[in-house]
Amino acid sequence: AQGQEEVKFAAPFAQTPGVFASVATENDPQPVNLRVSDCTNAGFQTAMQSEEASTPGHGVERLNWVAIQSGGGTTSDGSTIRVFESSVNSTLTPVPLGEGLRGRFPTVLGQVVSVVGGDPVELRFRDLRADSIGLVVEEEQSRDPEVGHAFEKVSVFLAD
């Protein structure tokens, strides 16, 4: 991928799924964030975003992604899974783990799925407790020390 690209699902989901994506290669040594946006039940947009202090442009990279139906349930082996969307900014936001995950300290995946403002951001997990996890969107600081950021939509996957 290079620039903004549209990803279409082979078949539409019943509702907008949780989308999780990453850059899978290192063809260009310059650090880059993968931004996901415009998620619908039919697909989403991706774009690589370089550090603020870097020169524009980035080499072609391979992107990996997975889309998981929003909601929750139990797998055949008894594992609890929860996929949902939340809204998070640069202030630590506690998010409840939900029934079946309390006290289990689950596996957590997350992805920022909006682009609000032009600064590169990443989703961070902090303060895992028996009943909640703290989420925060952090800006990188290559050009300036300011890290305040507006609310972004995030997809979250929890599984025990």
Q: Over which residues does each language-model region extend?
A:
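Extracellular receptor-binding modules and their adjoining Ser/Thr/Gly/Asp/Asn-rich linkers
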Residues: 1-160
